[in-house]
């Protein structure tokens, strides 16, 4: 009964993003073809940087779905923005066919913007502003002795704030240099890699990111205790759980996805949206398939402010690994076969490696003890609990631009 009341109350959010996403699939009917009225574009997406953020974020949700499918029984932690940034920067050196392939994967073909790279510079400036607490960086690394055309470097520096790196051919020296770069960009928050350098590199893309959230309302550390986290219907583990018996959050229930959705604000105009299935399960595919920039934007508009009993596991996770196969799955196999990067060099080169290193954490830390006085929770006739004590998905979103900053599938808060 409680769920039904919330469902009716927040029914406007159900299915908006999925319907919009489905309408973009090949062969689907459009308003023009059916004679139906054309839905006016949301004013939020008329802002160039927001529209670009939506496109890049949709790439991010695609990448997450592929990665999650590859690891159905493991945590997934990604900052897709850093990978998208590396690909977008690489497209500066691509001729038309190869450039179009990259732009389609990044959904640039759906936006009319003659200055994609200039707008990307604005997006990066917004999401990496100091108050956001996000560190994100990308780098293009080329094979040893490659002669790069001088015309490639200035636009790369102008829009993406980075210079390419050419390998020395000494794997120990190259790994040390890459580690030093990562340490400098992430201020030591992402661990140094001990993995060996790949033996055959032509183009190596590296995306790194780190985020430590600061809640708008901090948790009382005295209320943190070891509690059960349900890995599945049969297994539990003890993890540190933060709690707030009078938390103010934004909430809704999606009957199509059979999950409870909550949003908590962070400092710096960011927020985390949680997707919690109604039943304990590690199969989160139904939720994952719904995720698009448009759907998340609709959720952000429609959730209602309520007061609830809230418990959240403390989280400190990291990931280091290859995303090469995942990127290939996003209709980018041609970059690994015979692409045309003749704006970079006269020599045939191709993408051979995509690597991702990220760190993410939240704990009790926050800005204050009281929620914003301007936001009054709705009165409910029933108590509301929101316990993240089972597998869930979280989305870290930039409020200003709508950009996807981090996404995670948490099957075990202890990490792997």
UniProtKB/Swiss-Prot annotation:
Q: Which GO terms describe its molecular function?
A: serine-type endopeptidase inhibitor activity
Expressed in which tissues: Retinal pigment epithelial cells. Located in the interphotoreceptor matrix (IPM) which is between the retinal pigment epithelium and the neural retina.
* SMART domains per the UniProt record, alphabetical: SERPIN (SM00093)
Recite the UniProt keywords alphabetically.
Glycoprotein, Phosphoprotein, Secreted, Signal
Q: Per the UniProt annotation, where are the glycans attached?
A: 283
Grouped into one coarse class, the protein's main location is secreted
What SUPFAM superfamilies does its record include? Serpins (SSF56574)
Q: Which interval of the chain is the signal sequence?
A: 1-20
- In its keyword annotation, does this UniProt entry include Secreted? yes
Modified positions (Phosphoserine) in chain numbering = 112, 225
| Record's subcellular location | Secreted; Melanosome
Query: GO terms for biological process?
Result: negative regulation of angiogenesis; positive regulation of neurogenesis
Instruction: List, alphabetically, the GO terms of the cellular component aspect.
Output: extracellular region; extracellular space; melanosome
Query: What's the short name of a Pfam family annotated to this entry?
Result: Serpin
Q: Does the keyword Secreted apply?
A: yes
State whether it acts alone or in a complex, and with which partners, per the record: Interacts with PNPLA2; this interaction stimulates the phospholipase A2 activity of PNPLA2.
Regarding domains, what does the record say? The N-terminal (AA 42-139) exhibits neurite outgrowth-inducing activity. The C-terminal exposed loop (AA 380-416) is essential for serpin activity.
For this chain, the family text in UniProt reads: Belongs to the serpin family.
PANTHER family noted in UniProt: PIGMENT EPITHELIUM-DERIVED FACTOR, SERINE PROTEASE INHIBITOR, SERPIN
User: What does it do?
Assistant: Neurotrophic protein; induces extensive neuronal differentiation in retinoblastoma cells. Potent inhibitor of angiogenesis. As it does not undergo the S (stressed) to R (relaxed) conformational transition characteristic of active serpins, it exhibits no serine protease inhibitory activity.
Q: What is this protein called?
A: Pigment epithelium-derived factor
Name of the gene this protein is made from? SERPINF1
């Amino acid at each position: 009964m409680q769920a039904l009341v919330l469902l009716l109350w927040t029914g406007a959010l159900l299915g908006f993003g999925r319907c919009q996403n489905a309408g973009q699939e090949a062969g689907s009917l459009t308003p023009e073809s059916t004679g139906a009225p054309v839905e006016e574009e949301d004013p939020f997406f008329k802002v160039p940087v927001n529209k670009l953020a939506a496109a890049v974020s949709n790439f991010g949700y695609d990448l997450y779905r592929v990665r999650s499918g590859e690891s159905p029984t493991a945590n997934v932690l990604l900052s897709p923005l850093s990978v998208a940034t590396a690909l977008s920067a690489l497209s500066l050196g691509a001729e038309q066919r190869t450039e179009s392939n990259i732009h389609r994967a990044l959904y640039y073909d759906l936006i009319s913007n003659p200055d994609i790279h200039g707008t990307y510079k604005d997006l990066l400036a917004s999401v990496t502003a100091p108050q956001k607490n996000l560190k994100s960086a990308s780098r293009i690394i080329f094979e040893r002795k490659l002669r790069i055309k001088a015309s490639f470097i200035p636009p790369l520096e102008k829009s993406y704030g980075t210079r390419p790196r050419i390998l020395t051919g000494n794997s120990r020296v190259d790994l040390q240099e890459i580690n030093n770069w990562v340490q400098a960009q992430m201020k030591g928050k992402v661990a140094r890699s001990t993995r060996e350098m790949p033996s055959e590199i032509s183009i190596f893309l590296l995306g790194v990111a780190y985020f430590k959230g600061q809640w708008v309302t901090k948790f009382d550390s005295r209320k943190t205790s070891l509690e059960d986290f349900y890995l599945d219907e049969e297994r539990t583990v003890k993890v540190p759980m933060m709690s707030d018996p009078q938390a103010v959050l934004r909430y809704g229930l999606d009957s199509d996805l059979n999950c409870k959705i909550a949003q908590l604000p962070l400092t710096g105009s960011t927020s985390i949206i949680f997707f919690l299935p109604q039943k304990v399960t590690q199969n989160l595919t139904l939720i994952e398939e719904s995720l698009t920039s448009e759907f998340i934007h609709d959720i952000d508009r429609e959730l209602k402010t309520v007061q609830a009993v809230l418990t959240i596991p403390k989280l400190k996770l990291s990931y280091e690994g290859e995303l090469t196969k995942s990127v290939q799955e996003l209709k980018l196999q041609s970059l690994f076969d015979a692409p045309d990067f003749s704006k970079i060099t006269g020599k045939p080169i191709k993408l051979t490696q995509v690597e991702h290193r990220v760190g993410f954490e939240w704990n009790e830390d926050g800005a204050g003890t009281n929620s914003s006085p301007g936001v009054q929770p709705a009165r409910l006739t029933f108590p509301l609990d929101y316990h993240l004590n089972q597998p869930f998905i979280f989305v870290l979103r930039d409020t200003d631009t709508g950009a996807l900053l981090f996404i995670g599938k948490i099957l075990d808060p202890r990490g792997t």
